[in-house]
């Protein structure tokens, strides 16, 4: 059997990004997944992006990942969320045509250099002396490899719940993986349970659209990927309805039949994506909850009713659907359900996503306690890059809180772990003014180029964009008007007799790109995305100065690497409790050590002094 450098187990959103990233770095990569038709499957809602999540997608794209480009081949309803608020919290989002998304993903992966795909099931992993040796398929055959990336999604001992009915499955009509759960336990990983859910799917032909509110997308779709010039997929509307008092009464009368409330489910569900049962119980004073009716495709009559995830019995689901305006005669095509699955404590992995127990074993996606396609994909690309770099004996690729949302997510997980499905939010980032969706490529693409994970095409596009930014910035600094002339135009500026450039004007409240173009028509010929970027940078300029100072302080501590072989028990001024925490978590930088709960500032000072006296420098050994 051929030996591979990297084997990725699982073809979901984490798996496809991991496999593609590994292959881009030139190492032989094998992606193992049960079915060809499920590559990049959208198991839950047919959408990519959102608040914070959209920034994750842009970061994946900046590292030459797949998700942003694929959604641009399948997006049927683009919407910039939070646009009435500051640019730091804007959330690009797009509804997807499920069929087009899978088709585009399949076409890319099956033609990817250095990547092979095997449609099979993995039963076990062969490990010797705490190092990866091979994967073992369910037919007993072995495939040798150097590195393994586990991206198992909800398949680890997956169990679907519909009322009192239990169905062993990783997804509808797909078998779970018990073998890999057993493997992880045998290795010594502690497995816990999480839960997620999905709503019933509805036949759109049976909806009364006169009773629901139409929700159009943006007039001009803004692509996710820097590789996309224009979105050519037909755009369609979504719709909004809401629950009623009658809906709530049906749910309350049947709470004891819900798998969530009968005690049948052990796993903890996502706090910020609660089931409809949870909403009725936790927000009992609310008389209604919004439901977004999302088409699953241009030529697909299936509707995803976002907002009514449930584990109620199927017959109760039929009752509650008929109490919702516009859905009185709606037909359910597939019932909603909850699904439980195993995950590991993400403090068992490092910031490269390699496990601390086993050299060459990486975890990405829901196995680490996250929820969401974008969170999974962000981990997948990092795991794929690091597995390939390790094969090539090159330094690891570390994203930090200061340069990316992906870095924030990984740092949160590896520092604190999680007891519930982790979802990304803008509020999790202390540097969100500088790590926005609009500048993801400026933050990360150069890093990707330096390690060789960026294609020549993207490199060329990035180089041209950087030159255009500089030339546009020069133009904006050249175009100017006197304060008196601006006052005559109704623009409120201090009358100090000076000239104000366009970049100066961008700092004025309520002055925007459209006004600049009206005053200086030459700007019509400039790339609007670049104008928006420079507008945002100018608008935030004074805040960014302070934030960059904070980032510099962070990076100085981030640069203080802690040797892998450090013995914390030899630092006498640190308490035994803190020594044990540091030994367990194995932080690789001073910043990581500082973020471990219970590690005091005095302990950090003691570590820094110890490193200076023991190693006489800041380099890892």
Swiss-Prot record:
Residue positions binding NAD(+): 269-283
Binding-site residues for FAD, renumbered to this chain: 10-15, 122, 177, 366
Cell compartments where the protein resides: Cytoplasm
Molecular function terms, GO-annotated: flavin adenine dinucleotide binding
Main location class: cytoplasm
Keyword entries, A-Z: Cytoplasm, FAD, Flavoprotein, NAD, tRNA processing
InterPro entries from the UniProt entry: FAD/NAD-bd_sf, GIDA_C_N, MnmG, MnmG-rel, MnmG-rel_CS, MnmG_C, MnmG_C_subdom, MnmG_C_subdom_sf
Ranges that cross the membrane: none
Database matches in Pfam families: GIDA (PF01134), GIDA_C_1st (PF21680), SAM_GIDA_C (PF13932)
One cellular-component annotation, GO: cytosol
Cofactor(s) listed: FAD
Domain of life: Bacteria
Function: NAD-binding protein involved in the addition of a carboxymethylaminomethyl (cmnm) group at the wobble position (U34) of certain tRNAs, forming tRNA-cmnm(5)s(2)U34.
Record-linked HAMAP family: MnmG_GidA (MF_00129)
Recorded family membership: Belongs to the MnmG family.
Protein name per its UniProtKB record: tRNA uridine 5-carboxymethylaminomethyl modification enzyme MnmG
Organism of origin: Rickettsia bellii (strain OSU 85-389)
Name of the gene this protein is made from: mnmG
